[in-house]
Amino acid sequence: MQRRYFAAYRNKKLENKDFTIISNNCWAGMIYESYNLPKMSPTIGSFFMPDDYLRFCKDIRRYLTLELSFIEPYESKYANKLSGNERFGTYPIGLLGDVEIMFLHYHTADEAKVKWERRCGRINWDKTIYKFNDQNGCTPANVIDFFSLPIDHKLFFTIHKEWPKINDDGFYIIEQKANANEITTSHEPFGSNRYFDLTKMINML
């Protein structure tokens, strides 16, 4: 509620309003809503497993030329890992080459594909932020790989204070009382707060 209530105020602080966020989870959509902006990212309403997200980001332009297809939940290479979640099997799973995309907030594959293709056409490659976090079995090794990617404007959020701070620029430890294993999307920062100033980062793109 707070995220959307102050959206108009945050929007006035923005100088760049045509940015793209490539996120490993639903954070991108939350950010566009928090600024009351059109969604300029295909990763809205979906999530990637860590290895697939890193693979996708490393060669994103090639992956986005591939035809998005869909598989049954039992065909997912992550079926055993995700089957314990009650929502597994209720959402479409997309496939771009060897990368799986979990379209968590979509009801059908057709809906997911239409919005994916439409938003791919909105990507602003000159103003792109890549956001990763500690969800879905992410390890410190994954974080090292993320900050080693040949891309600019990287953000990483974690609740793990014991993890080594891989990078002084873009690595943020977030306090969270609930769920001690990984950060929840609702706890990831937006706007300007005590962790960092996203508005400032966007304006500097």
Region locations from a protein language model:
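A short acidic, amphipathic alpha-helical/loop segment
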Residues: 118-119, 140-146
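Acidic/glycine-enriched edge-of-secondary-structure segments
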Residues: 86-111, 125-127, 131
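Structural motif
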Residues: 23-25, 105-107, 129-136, 158-160
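Non-catalytic accessory regions used for complex assembly or targeting
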Residues: 1-4, 31-32, 58, 62, ...
